[in-house]
Curated annotation (Swiss-Prot):
Belongs to the sigma-70 factor family. RpoD/SigA subfamily. It comes from Chlamydia muridarum (strain MoPn / Nigg). GO terms for cellular component: cytoplasm. CDD domains: Sigma70_r4 (cd06171). It is found in: Cytoplasm. This is RNA polymerase sigma factor SigA. The keyword Membrane does not apply. GO terms for biological process: DNA-templated transcription initiation. It comes from the Bacteria. Residues 515-534 bind DNA. One of its GO terms (molecular function) is sigma factor activity. Pfam families: Sigma70_r1_1 (PF03979), Sigma70_r1_2 (PF00140), Sigma70_r2 (PF04542), Sigma70_r3 (PF04539), Sigma70_r4 (PF04545). A motif (Interaction with polymerase core subunit RpoC) lies at residues 345-348.
Length: 571
């Protein structure tokens, strides 16, 4: 009996030692990884360690050691975050600038925002949806909404507004049928609005009993409910309804100013008849505005406070969704670098696409937000590149044609091993050779003359281009010497001979004149001028004179072949 007890104690000690060793193994693994999974705990612990109480003790022990226990799904998510963090760190290192560089700071700050699970995305979307419903409900209480809706409906009927910009198309099955119903809907709204105005004016009657007031208020509430139902039949997009809200806020400011004016006049009205008259006028003005709004001042203030609160909640939820998906923008934007826009510009354009995706996301369809947002972000980035990347803007459809031609050229080059001719490329794509040449010409990127060459920044591209309009110093010196020598030689001729040569060859202003034009200056015939010119040229060919000018023949030949013009030699 004693031996059995000793054997049992020895077995318990061995088992306890094994458990201790396994726990140490768990802690070591957790410290190496920074966490441990439930699957790893089950693998490491011995099979005998299977009761819930024992497992709980192990989990309590690990918690006391600050060891994080995760599910396998959490581990995969954590690995994905680490991978993204490394990518962001690499981008931050590659982005130029000092530690306070905006790109670096943006990437660093963005990396601290955790990603959302599908459940969290749905929860945020529900918050946005709830806020939008409440915003719409409050805005449609005001008579301003009726006037705005009727105005927009008239624009739709007359074709002055795009249907998809105003109406939520998912709510409308038949566009033609909807447009045919609009006139009837407008008529019903106007009737309800007139009825509402009549009841509001009737409430002002001081002779009304409490019972009549209660009856009128009840009728008013029913009228408002019917009006809101008709307004919802317009199926306006949420951003259009929010535009109605801008009218409400603008009117609210004028209400507050009028209320302040009334409060100031109340103090002075007791001892000043003029102030009392102004107070009465201000109160009448306030009443007219209350009728125009369809709400009393107190109701107006209460509704606006609620409207602002729900708008803040909507913005907060949208901001949370956007900030949690900024990494998605980075992952897409980095694929479009070196296409004419800076990385920061690509991020900004992608963020605008992300915000549009948040506005239009429908969580009930079942897909993840990132799947839906990818298309909006990509569209925003590619559209920005098409619109802004080039100095001379190329339409989006032409960008697609250029890409098609470039892809076709690349394919033919891989098949044939040489650059395809316009004829070969046109045959492959169904274009004429001239069309292919035109597309290639459009695809060329203009280069700024101020573009820096090299890393030093000391020289620009324009410094390496020849300016044919500027005279070289050697030519300028040569022509200056020729001009001086020509003056000396011409002085050896008579005044008439010198005048004829200067004007016949354009030595004065660079424009040669005809015999008739020179003859009119001397009032002689063309033949007489020709004789004077021939005599003067014979004198110029004399060795004494021609010897002085022969050295400049090369300069004159170069000038004739270069520009085809003769320079003037005027002082």
């Amino acid at each position: 009996m004693r031996m059995d007890t000793l054997d049992s104690q020895a077995a318990d000690a061995a088992q306890e030692e094994e458990i201790q060793r396994k726990l140490e193994e768990l802690v070591t693994l957790a410290k190496d990884q920074g966490f441990i999974t439930y699957e790893e705990i089950n693998e490491i612990l011995p099979p005998s360690f299977d009761s819930p109480e024992q497992i709980d003790q192990v989990l309590i022990f690990l918690a006391g050691m600050d060891v994080q226990v995760l599910n396998q799904a959490d581990v995969e998510r954590q690995k994905e975050r680490k991978k993204e963090a490394k990518e962001l760190e690499g981008l931050a290192k590659r982005s130029e600038g000092t530690p306070d560089d905006p790109v670096r700071m943006y990437l660093k700050e963005m990396g601290t925002v955790p990603l959302l699970t599908r459940e969290e995305e749905v929860e945020i979307s529900k918050r946005i949806e709830k806020a939008q419903v409440q915003i719409e409900r409050i805005i449609l209480r005001f008579r301003y909404s009726t006037k705005e809706a009727v105005s927009i409906a008239q624009y739709l009927i007359n074709g002055k507004e795009r249907f998809d910009k105003i109406v939520s198309e998912k709510e409308v099955e038949d566009k033609t049928h909807f447009l045919n119903l609009l006139p009837k809907l407008i008529s019903l709204l106007k009737e309800e609005d007139s009825y509402l105005e009549e009841r509001l004016l009737a409430l002002k009657d001081p002779a009304l009993s409490k019972q009549d007031q209660a009856k009128l208020n009840d009728e008013l509430e029913k009228c408002r409910i019917r009006t809101q139902a008709y307004l919802r039949c317009f199926h306006c997009r949420h951003n259009v309804t929010e535009d109605f809200g801008e009218v409400v806020f603008k009117a609210y400011d004028s209400f507050l100013q009028l209320e302040q004016q009334i409060n100031d006049l109340k103090v002075r009205a007791e001892r000043n008849k003029f102030a009392a008259a102004k107070l009465a006028a201000a109160r009448r003005k306030l009443y007219k505005r209350e009728v125009a709004a369809g709400r009393t001042l107190e109701e107006f203030k209460k509704d606006v406070r609620m409207l602002q609160r729900w708008m803040d909640k909507s913005q907060e939820a949208k901001k949370e969704m956007v900030e949690s998906n900024l990494r998605l923008v980075i992952s897409i934007a980095k694929k479009y670098t070196n296409r004419g826009l800076s990385f920061l510009d690509l991020i900004q354009e992608g963020n605008m696409g992300l915000m549009k995706a948040v506005e239009k996301f429908e969580y009930r369809r079942g897909y993840k937000f990132s799947t839906y947002a990818t298309w909006w972000i990509r569209q925003a980035v590619t559209r920005a590149i098409a619109d802004q990347a080039r100095t001379i803007r190329i339409p989006v459809h032409m960008i697609e044609t250029i890409n098609k031609v470039l892809r076709g050229a690349k394919k033919l080059m891989m098949e044939t091993g040489k650059e395809p001719t316009p004829e070969e490329l046109g045959e492959e794509l169904g274009f004429t050779p001239d069309r292919v040449r035109e597309i290639y010409k459009i695809a060329q990127h203009p280069i700024s003359l101020q573009a820096e060459v090299g890393d030093s920044g000391e020289s620009s591209f324009g410094d390496f281009l020849e300016d044919t309009a500027v005279e070289s110093p050697a030519e300028a010196t040569g022509y200056s010497m020729l001009k001086d020598k020509m003056k000396e030689v011409l002085k050896t001729l008579t005044d008439r001979e010198r005048f004829v040569l200067i004007h016949r060859f354009g030595l004065l202003d660079g424009r040669p004149k005809t015999l008739e034009e020179v003859g009119s200056a001397f009032n002689v015939t063309r033949e007489r001028i020709r004789q004077i010119e021939a005599k003067a040229l014979r004198k110029m060919r004399h060795p004494i004179r021609s010897k002085q000018l022969r050295a400049f023949l090369d300069l004159l030949e170069e000038e004739k072949t270069g520009s085809g013009k003769i320079k003037s030699y005027k002082n």
